[in-house]
């Protein structure tokens, strides 16, 4: 699959073994192929996992209340903290590509390989950031389709308003504070 091959090339360029560290969508596809199903985690995560499999594009769901300030994809300094799902604290290696916030928390390691237990979706989560990334040739048209699919499903299932955007080198920011303000307004109404 072109979508997976592009991530494997990207991981190789980062110095990672692409069959040891797989992007999230490849890991989901492998698990689904081997087991015939995926574990049920949370309705929103299950929905995003199904869409990730359908598009072969990694999708992550972050609990916005666990993110300090903005989140950015960048190289680690090595001082960031990453909370595993088992509760252990790790420190990403310097130059590793991570999702980091203003407090030095790493919310994902090895770019799209592993999400942090800190910002994982839980039953008490009220506001989320859903991120989809792709590197393959038709990513510029496939990612907006994936985002539209998620937005349509969220509106149909939960009747919620979704703010969405596509980031690029010419438009590298998505204002999380506006997304949080929208969520707060919805809770107050």
Predicted regions span which residues?
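RNA/tRNA-interacting regions in translation and RNA-turnover enzymes
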Residues: 1-189
């Amino acid at each position: 699959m072109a979508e997976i091959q592009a991530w494997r090339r990207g991981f190789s360029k980062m110095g990672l073994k692409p069959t040891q560290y797989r992007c999230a969508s490849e890991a989901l596809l492998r698990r689904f192929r081997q087991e015939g199903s995926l574990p049920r985690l949370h309705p929103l995560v299950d929905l995003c996992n199904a869409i990730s499999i359908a598009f072969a594009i990694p999708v992550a769901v972050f609990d916005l209340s666990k993110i300090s300030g903005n989140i950015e994809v960048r190289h680690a300094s090595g001082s960031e903290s990453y909370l595993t799902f088992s509760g252990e604290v790790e420190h990403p290696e310097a130059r590793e590509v991570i999702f980091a916030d203003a407090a030095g928390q790493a919310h994902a390691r090895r770019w799209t390989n592993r999400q942090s237990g800190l910002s994982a979706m839980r039953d008490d989560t009220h506001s989320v950031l859903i991120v989809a990334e792709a590197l393959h040739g038709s990513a510029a048209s496939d990612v907006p389709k994936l985002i539209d699919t998620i937005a349509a499903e969220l509106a149909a299932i939960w009747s919620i308003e979704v703010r969405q955007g596509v980031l690029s080198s010419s438009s590298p920011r998505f204002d999380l504070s506006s997304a949080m303000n929208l969520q707060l307004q919805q809770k107050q109404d």
